[in-house]
């Protein structure tokens, strides 16, 4: 890239030096921290203000450079708080900036803010580096595709801390900064590329429909394309604004300050009459800390106190490392709980989990379907050998499907292999659009069945087993068809024996007051409104499922205590009475595990499956908790 003039080069370096000072190495999280902002200022003014604010004990928390590289403008937010020493640079060409970056990196400093403006061959850079403890961090400012950033991190999971799309519409460049994701923080960032531009309005709506999610940064390009970043941390009340002029931004800051909200991110783009800003406001300038809480009792072990300390320690290590906010663990003996603990690792605006709170169960829901079939067989209302489609009056396109019986469906050997033909339980939108109504209404379970029977099987029934969500869905339809009672009503009357087990409804609006938040960062197209392009959270249809139609396979909710009690008299896997085995459940926003082990039955529920890795969860369910149960004898 071309070098800047000597005058600008000296200005950037002198400004860098004037902003250097050492502060204590411990930040404070203060709701009422004094906040200073400026925007639409040139480099000299930015340097002057930086020097004065540093002298008064302020730290920079948001930095944006924009406009022409020959006369870049700056927007910044400073907060008066203690913290580690830091360095600042601005108006630096690529060579100067990279040299500065490497110099301070070699001294243990970490990049925390980065911005750039101008065409790829003549861009100028600005940034902040702090003397903080981040084991691994990565920054690349020559990316031609933002998705290529993941190739630079060496498989280290990172949180994007800084971003700028610069260059020209014909020759984009992306500057991305990421810090190693310690604690499994959940964030998203939605990139635009020359071939795809994010619809900000619909993306913003989808992301903030996820409970407790908020915008953290609204990065802005010179041509006013917003790259939004979202987080699930808590900063109290918040608001945002986009496409603001300088005068509108000033007015907005004053209006929000009167409400007790302060700017925590300002991004600028354009120059002259095209200068525009995005801004995020919040009650707090830094996220709330998480707190550890435990509820419930352990009553049935020889040493209840020691057992309590051990299992609480196991769960705390797992939850803090993996960022899991809500969980339960329960143990039962002959249908009576001898331990029920609920765990919360969350901010103070989330509910503290109680032992009787209910969690989405994912595929653990299938054991209620198996118990229903067992009830029908034991009451001579159904046989395991009954051909299912003939019973329901269907004529499948594939004649082999006429041989599918109840046992095939229970054993996942009916001829459906989701690795070959897809999983209908997550295809409600596609199925609805294939109907004569062309997606004018959501698909029902009956629509799914009729869609499937018109397709060829993936293998001959009985040849082998392939895990299927469709098989239990079909069996739940059989239950309703035989009894004349809706499946959920049948469960309540004949299977649950008073246990609090219920349907987890699809719509996010049904869960705004839930104590348990089924957490997922993912969104997807809405299957309840198949003609809409609207995005919805993963647990609320974004995974493609309409849960009201999937009750037999993965849509039920209950507490860990209810699960442990239930498997004391019902097969946790298979069909019939209690048997030593286990069942696993995984779904967007949910993870559950139940096991009958020797004489005891135990259950684990989590409000997310987005922990660090499956290895972490496997260690918990297959080793840590079973080892605990082996090490602490049951009383009596």
Swiss-Prot record:
Alphabetical list of Pfam families matching this protein:
Beta-lactamase, BTRD1
Under Enzyme Commission nomenclature, its number is 3.4.21.-
Region described as Disordered: 512-540
Keywords, in A-Z order: Disulfide bond, Glycoprotein, Hydrolase, Secreted, Signal, Virulence
Cystine links in this protein are: 141-175
Cellular component aspect of the GO annotation: extracellular region
Q: Please name the GO terms of the biological process aspect recorded for this protein, alphabetically.
A: effector-mediated suppression of host defense response
> Localized where?
Secreted
Which region is the signal sequence?
1-22
The record lists the catalysed reaction(s) as: a glycyl-glycyl-[protein] + H2O = N-terminal glycyl-[protein] + [protein]-C-terminal glycine
Tell me, what is one Gene Ontology molecular-function annotation carried by this entry?
serine-type endopeptidase activity
Q: Which residues are glycosylated?
A: 30, 151, 383, 481
Report if keyword Hydrolase is assigned: yes
Chief subcellular site?
secreted
**The keyword Signal is annotated on this UniProt entry:** yes
Query: Which PROSITE patterns has this protein been placed in?
Result: PROKAR_LIPOPROTEIN (PS51257)
Catalytic residues per the record?
363
Regarding protein family, the annotation reads: Belongs to the peptidase S12 family.
Function text: Serine-type endopeptidase that cleaves Gly-Gly bonds in the polyglycine linker of host plant class IV chitinases to disrupt their chitin-binding, and thereby plays a role in lowering the defense responses of the host to the fungus. Degrades Z.mays Endochitinase A (CHIA) in vitro, although corn is not its host species.
Protein name from the UniProt record:
Polyglycine hydrolase
| Organism annotation | Fusarium vanettenii (strain ATCC MYA-4622 / CBS 123669 / FGSC 9596 / NRRL 45880 / 77-13-4) (Fusarium solani subsp. pisi)
């Amino acid at each position: 890239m071309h070098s800047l003039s000597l005058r600008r080069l000296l200005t950037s370096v002198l400004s860098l030096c004037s902003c250097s000072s050492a502060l204590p190495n411990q930040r404070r999280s203060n709701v009422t921290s004094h906040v200073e902002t400026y925007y639409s200022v040139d480099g000299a003014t930015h340097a002057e203000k930086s020097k004065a604010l540093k002298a008064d004990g302020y730290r920079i928390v948001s930095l944006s450079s924009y406009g022409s590289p020959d006369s870049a403008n700056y927007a910044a937010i400073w907060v008066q708080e203690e913290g580690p020493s830091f360095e600042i640079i601005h108006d630096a060409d690529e060579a100067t900036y990279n040299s500065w970056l490497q110099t301070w990196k070699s001294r243990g400093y970490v990049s925390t803010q980065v911005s750039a403006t101008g065409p790829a061959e003549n861009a100028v850079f600005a940034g902040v580096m702090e003397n903080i403890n981040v084991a691994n961090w990565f920054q690349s400012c020559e990316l031609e595709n933002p998705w290529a950033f993941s190739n630079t991190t060496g498989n280290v999971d990172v949180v994007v801390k800084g971003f700028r799309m610069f260059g020209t519409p014909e020759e984009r460049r992306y500057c991305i900064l990421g810090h190693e994701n310690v604690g499994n923080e959940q964030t998203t960032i939605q990139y635009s590329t020359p071939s795809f531009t994010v619809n900000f309005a619909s993306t913003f709506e989808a992301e903030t429909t996820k409970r407790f999610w908020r915008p953290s940064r609204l990065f802005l390009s010179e041509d006013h394309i917003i790259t939004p970043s979202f987080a699930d941390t808590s900063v109290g009340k918040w608001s945002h604004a986009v496409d603001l002029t300088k005068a509108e931004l000033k007015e907005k800051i004053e209006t929000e300050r009167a409400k007790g909200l302060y700017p925590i991110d300002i991004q600028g783009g354009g120059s002259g009459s095209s200068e525009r800003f995005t801004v995020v406001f919040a009650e707090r300038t830094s996220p709330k800390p998480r707190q550890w809480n435990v509820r419930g009792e352990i009553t049935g072990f020889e040493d209840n106190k020691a057992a309590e300390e051990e299992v609480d320690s196991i769960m705390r290590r797992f939850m803090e490392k993996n960022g899991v906010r809500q969980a339960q663990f329960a143990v039962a003996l002959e249908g009576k709980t001898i331990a029920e603990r609920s765990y919360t690792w969350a901010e103070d605006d989330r509910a503290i989990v109680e032992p009787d709170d209910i969690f989405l169960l994912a595929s653990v829901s299938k054991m209620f379907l198996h118990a229903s079939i067992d009830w029908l067989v034991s009451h001579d209302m159904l046989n395991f050998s009954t051909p299912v489609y003939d019973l329901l009056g269907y004529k499948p396109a594939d004649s082999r499907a006429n041989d599918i019986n109840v046992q095939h469906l229970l054993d996942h050997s009916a001829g459906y292999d989701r690795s070959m033909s897809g999983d209908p339980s997550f295809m409600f939108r596609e199925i609805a659009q294939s109907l004569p109504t062309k997606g004018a209404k959501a698909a029902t379970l009956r629509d799914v069945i009729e869609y499937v029977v018109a397709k060829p099987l993936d293998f001959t029934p009985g040849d082998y087993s392939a895990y299927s969500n469709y098989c239990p869905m079909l069996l739940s339809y059989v239950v309703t068809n035989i009894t004349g009672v809706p499946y959920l009503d049948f469960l309540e009357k004949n299977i649950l024996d008073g246990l609090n087990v219920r349907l987890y409804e699809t719509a996010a609006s049904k869960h705004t007051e839930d104590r348990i938040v089924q957490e997922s960062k993912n969104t997807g197209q809405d299957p309840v409104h198949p003609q809409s392009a609207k995005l919805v959270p993963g647990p609320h249809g974004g995974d493609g499922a309409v849960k009201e139609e999937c009750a037999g396979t993965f849509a039920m909710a209950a507490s860990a205590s209810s699960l442990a009690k239930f498997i004391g008299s019902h097969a946790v896997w298979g069909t019939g009475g209690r048997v030593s085995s286990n069942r696993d459940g995984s779904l967007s926003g949910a993870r559950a595990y139940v096991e009958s082990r020797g004489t005891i039955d135990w259950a684990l529920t989590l409000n997310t499956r987005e922990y660090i890795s499956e290895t972490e969860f496997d260690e918990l369910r297959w080793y840590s908790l079973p080892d605990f149960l082996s090490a602490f004898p049951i009383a009596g």
